[in-house]
Each structure stands twice: as C-alpha cells, then as structure tokens.
C-alpha cells in the first residue's frame, strides 16, 4: 500500500496553491511596506490606541517567546512546514482545505521572512547573517490593545502570516470537530 493515496496535485490543487501563493505575497508585501515607511517601535494610531501599526522584529517563536533564537526558530518552522505538507497529503480528507491553505500560507510567509535581513528605510536584503545594525527576524506590525482584564495590556504585535495561521487553525478546528460529530 502506498503511503500517499493521492497525487500531490490532487490534494494541493492549483487553486489551493494559488491561494497559498497569494497569502505569501500579501504577507511579504505588507512587511516590505512597513519596513519602508516605519521606524522600529514607533507607531501610527489607526483606531486610537486600540489598533496601532508598530514595526517590531520577532527573533524568537510565537508571541516573541525565546527572543534571539532565530536559527532554532527557522529550523522549527521548516520542520513544521514539511510535517504539515506530508500530514495534509496523507490525510487529504481531514478538515477544510481552505483552513489548510491559510495555515500553509502563514507558515511559508513567516519562514521566508526569517531568511531576510530587514533594513528600515530601504527594505529587505536576502541573506541570513548576524545582526550588524540591521534587523533579523519576522516583521510584526499589527498592534492591538485589549481590555485590562487580560494578563497584558497590549497583545503581542503580529502580521498577515500570523493572521492566516490563526484563521486557518480556527477553520480546521471547527471543521474537524463537525466531522468528528457526524
């Protein structure tokens, strides 16, 4: 018995690959624009103090945990992407494909972003090198203030790729739960 019952393009149809590509492009373009027009840790209020755009760099993992661990973060993200591709291919009928597409777009967007050195005012330069007055890490810029009853006053800044992963996982959790109940 073959491990993968379906061909790759039967599971990852061209329309799905197009959505993944579109998500990656949207993520990287927004990050590029923020790099060009914002200075690190200076913000622009969009909806008062509730929603601001603030350029930050995450050199760690989720929510900025374990900062200055760019290489382990890059490796972990790469392993997760390979796992997700294989898992989705093997379990092609599990969950909503659009949820998978969004998770993949976000994972690839942040993975690619980890390979670029960011230079405020000039944009991106390809290469993974030590920080020499430049910025290495994932660009985060969507900055929300939440009610004071939460453990922190501002949610950690995030980006379009993070939004894709969150929305995609939410879709997958709900659709898998519905499939389980049937």
UniProtKB/Swiss-Prot annotation:
Keyword set, alphabetical order: Aspartyl protease, Cell inner membrane, Cell membrane, Hydrolase, Membrane, Protease, Transmembrane, Transmembrane helix
EC number(s) per entry: 3.4.23.36
A Pfam family per the record: Peptidase_A8
Pathway(s) this gene product operates in, as recorded in its UniProt entry: Protein modification; lipoprotein biosynthesis (signal peptide cleavage)
Primary location class: membrane
Gene Ontology MF terms in the entry: aspartic-type endopeptidase activity; endopeptidase activity
Subcellular location: Cell inner membrane
Active site positions: 140, 162
Record family assignment: Belongs to the peptidase A8 family.
Name recorded for this polypeptide: Lipoprotein signal peptidase
């Amino acid at each position: 018995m073959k491990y993968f019952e379906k061909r790759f393009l039967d599971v990852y149809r061209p329309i799905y690959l197009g959505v993944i590509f579109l998500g990656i492009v949207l993520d990287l373009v927004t990050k590029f624009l923020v790099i060009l027009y914002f200075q690190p840790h200076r913000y622009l209020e969009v909806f008062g103090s509730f929603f601001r755009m603030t350029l930050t760099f995450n050199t760690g993992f989720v929510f900025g945990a374990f900062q200055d661990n760019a290489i382990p973060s890059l490796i972990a993200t790469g392993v997760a992407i390979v796992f997700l591709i294989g898992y989705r291919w093997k379990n092609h009928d599990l969950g909503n494909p659009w949820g998978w597409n969004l998770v993949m777009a976000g994972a690839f967007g942040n993975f690619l972003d980890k390979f670029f050195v960011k230079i405020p005012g000039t944009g991106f330069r390809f290469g993974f090198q030590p920080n020499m007055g430049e910025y290495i890490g994932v660009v985060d810029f969507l900055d929300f203030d939440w009610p004071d009853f939460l453990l922190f006053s501002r949610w950690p800044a995030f980006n379009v790729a993070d939004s894709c992963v969150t929305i995609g996982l939410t879709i997958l959790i709900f659709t898998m739960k519905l499939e389980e109940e049937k």
